[in-house]
Each structure stands twice: as structure tokens, then as C-alpha cells.
Amino acid sequence: MSMANFTGGRNSCTFHEEFKQVLLPLVYSVVFLLGLPLNAVVIGQIWLARKALTRTTIYMLNLAMADLLYVCSLPLLIYNYTQKDYWPFGDFTCKFVRFQFYTNLHGSILFLTCISVQRYMGICHPLASWHKKKGKKLTWLVCAAVWFIVIAQCLPTFVFASTGTQRNRTVCYDLSPPDRSTSYFPYGITLTITGFLLPFAAILACYCSMARILCQKDELIGLAVHKKKDKAVRMIIIVVIVFSISFFPFHLTKTIYLIVRSSASLPCPTLQAFAIAYKCTRPFASMNSVLDPILFYFTQRKFRESTRYLLDKMSSKWRQDHCISYGS
């Protein structure tokens, strides 16, 4: 039986969390098995076409790198949850794995924001030249700034996340130990605002402006904008799916959970209900590591064409070998 002790304020509760032994290893295994090859292929594909990098593919490259680094840490979490929260890998590894999760989460959000702004400029301001003059150099500087901001945002994870002891077993706390829930609360809320709400507001503003242009009759928009219309629509749909599955449910349940676990008056069943809701959405926040490569595939025509060419070549090779084997 999997249980977690919670002690904060005047509350001392024992949570029953058997669901984590099934849900979290299952979702993390799917993310690992799909995310590792998909992001490796994206990075390899961009590397092969590095002489023809665009601003969007530079953002996609950084997005794939963040996803790949994160999925490499998932085997530790899969082992942890299959062993009923037992963490044998030490305190620093616990802190680093939690740091990996949040840097990937908020890095993905910011890089998707950059891609959305880039697409917004192409659709709503196709004749503007200020963002084109700097070209790739400006894009690389933006990526460096994103990494700096994300690392600075998530560094306090090394202070709050830590190992502890429950029922004579070492565990790795996700947010903070229960007795530090009150001190973690301001940081957790600030991270949600700066790492999710503000970028999400920027994306919504870009998409509303883009929708106004894309919904116009074709004869009212320029040829250059018309060519980008389908690509922009695909990107909007996929980014909305990523936010709907990965980001919004997680941040909503996390914020509510931070509020209730900092309270000194709520009964244990209420605390457990919100804890379960939060911990059920947490593994799905990792799904962006699978969805991001799909975004790359559906918004990059050259990548789709090269992928089809590779698959056709592999299929032809298989049919040829199969016919030879059958004939002999």
C-alpha cells in the first residue's frame, strides 16, 4: 500500500496514493518510449539541415533539446513510483530530477511563446523588417535569454525539493517537504504567474490577432500571408492541444493544491482530494515532450517531405527484401 504523510500548519494527514503506482509509471513510460526517439529525430533532422535554419526551426531545436534532456530522467521516476515512492538515488539527484521537470515545463512554454510570436509577426506584420534584419543572430540571443530566464526561475527547486523519510523509506518530494509548504507557497505562485500565466496571455494575444487576419476573405490578404495560412492554423491547433493536455490542467490543480496545503484548517479528506487531482495531472504535464515533435512535423513541410521519403525508402527496401526471400 502506498501512503504519504502530510504535516503542515495544524494538519497531520496520511494520504493513500495507490494510484501513483499505476498511473505515473504508465504515463512516464509512454512519454519516455515515444519522446526519446521523436525528439532525437527532430534534433537530427534539424542538424542535417543546419545550413538552411529558419528562425522557427531554431526555436524548435531548443524545444527538442529541452524535451530530450527531460525524458532522459524519466527512468528514475518510473523506478521511484513502481517501488512505492522509494528513492535510492540520493538528495542531489532528487533535486536535479525535479529541476529537470520544471525547466522542461517552463522552457517549453516560453519556446512555444517565441514560436507563436514569430508566426504572429509573419501573419500580422508580413512587411515589417526590424525583426528580419537581425535574423538568426537575434533568434539565438532570444533562445539564450529563454534558457537564462528558465534556469533562474527554477533554481529555487534545488532549495525546496529534497529527500525525506516516510515509514522508514527514503522519498523524493516534488514541491517541498510538507513542513515547508507555507514557505514554498510564494515561490510556487510566482512561478505559475511568470512561467505560465504571462506567456499564456502573450500567446492568446498573438492568436486573437492572427485569427482576425486568417478569418478574412482570401482576396483581402496578401499572397505571402495566404501561403502561411494553413501552416499557422495547424500550429494554432497543436499548441492549443498542448496547453489543453499538458499545461493548463497541471497549473490549475497545482495552484489549488498549493493554496489548500498551506491552509491550517482544512480536513484531511479535502487535502487528499486536491493532492490526488494535482498528482494525476502531473504526469500529463510531461506529455508535451511527445506533442512538441508532432508540432514540428506538422508545421515544417521539408521535415514532412524528408520523413515520407525515408519511410518510402524503408518500405521499398523491405518489399524488395521480402520479394527476394519469397522467390528463393
From Swiss-Prot:
Membrane-side (Extracellular) residue stretches: 1-22, 79-96, 161-189, 253-275
Membrane-crossing segments per the record: 23-43, 58-78, 97-117, 140-160, 190-210, 232-252, 276-298
Coiled coil: none
Biological process, per Gene Ontology: cellular response to prostaglandin E stimulus; cellular response to purine-containing compound; cellular response to pyrimidine ribonucleotide; G protein-coupled receptor signaling pathway; phospholipase C-activating G protein-coupled receptor signaling pathway; positive regulation of ERK1 and ERK2 cascade; positive regulation of inositol trisphosphate biosynthetic process; positive regulation of vascular associated smooth muscle cell proliferation
Membrane topology: Multi-pass membrane protein
Cytoplasmic side of membrane: 44-57, 118-139, 211-231, 299-323
Pfam families attached to this UniProt entry: 7tm_1
Localization terms from the record: Cell membrane
One GO cellular component, as annotated: plasma membrane
Keywords on record: Cell membrane, Disulfide bond, G-protein coupled receptor, Glycoprotein, Membrane, Receptor, Transducer, Transmembrane, Transmembrane helix
Glycosylated position list: 5
GO molecular function: G protein-coupled ADP receptor activity; G protein-coupled UDP receptor activity; G protein-coupled UTP receptor activity
Residue pairs linked by disulfide bridges in the UniProt entry: 94-172
Role noted for this protein: Receptor for extracellular ADP > UTP > ATP = UDP. The activity of this receptor is mediated by G proteins which activate a phosphatidylinositol-calcium second messenger system.
Similarity field: Belongs to the G-protein coupled receptor 1 family.
PANTHER family linked to this entry: P2Y PURINOCEPTOR 6, PURINOCEPTOR-RELATED G-PROTEIN COUPLED RECEPTOR
Protein name per the record: P2Y purinoceptor 3
Gene it is expressed from: P2RY3
